[in-house]
Curated annotation (Swiss-Prot):
The keyword Ribosomal protein applies. Pfam families: Ribosomal_L18p. One of its GO terms (biological process) is translation. GO terms for molecular function: 5S rRNA binding; structural constituent of ribosome. This is one of the proteins that bind and probably mediate the attachment of the 5S RNA into the large ribosomal subunit, where it forms part of the central protuberance. Belongs to the universal ribosomal protein uL18 family. Gene3D superfamilies: 3.30.420.100. This is Large ribosomal subunit protein uL18. Keywords: Ribonucleoprotein, Ribosomal protein, RNA-binding, rRNA-binding. It comes from the Bacteria. GO terms for cellular component: cytosolic large ribosomal subunit.
Length: 115
């Protein structure tokens, strides 16, 4: 069952990336595990990481909860403004828009990102 859930998530992620690959816009790509959450802003060509934030940083320990996701969202918004990125496409990597994913997205929007 676990393998089927992962396959379905990866299929959803592939559909999003195929649809947005031709658009000339940066992606805010996230990944979550049971203990951590990661966020990266990837260039429009898909080959360069412009900014990143995760709960692996010393300031953002205890990363398996919604509060840590909010802090990562704020950090990625701050990092994005430092590299002059305002508009992104939110790539949730096939994860449901609920809980930690939603908290990260809301915090990034409040930080100034537009998606």
């Amino acid at each position: 069952m676990k393998f089927l859930k992962k396959q379905a998530r990866l299929r959803r992620a592939t559909k999003f990336r195929a649809k947005h690959a031709k658009k000339d816009i940066e992606r805010l790509c996230i990944h979550k595990t049971a203990q951590h959450i990661y966020a990266q802003i990837i260039s429009s060509c898909g080959t360069k990481i412009l900014a990143s934030a995760s709960t692996l940083k010393a300031k953002l320990k205890n990363g398996g909860n919604v509060d840590a996701a909010v802090k990562v969202g704020e950090a990625i918004a701050k990092a994005a403004t430092s590299v002059k990125v305002k508009k992104v496409a939110f790539d949730r990597s096939g994860f449901k828009y609920h809980g930690r994913v939603k908290a990260l997205a809301d915090a990034a929007r409040e930080g100034g990102l537009d998606f």
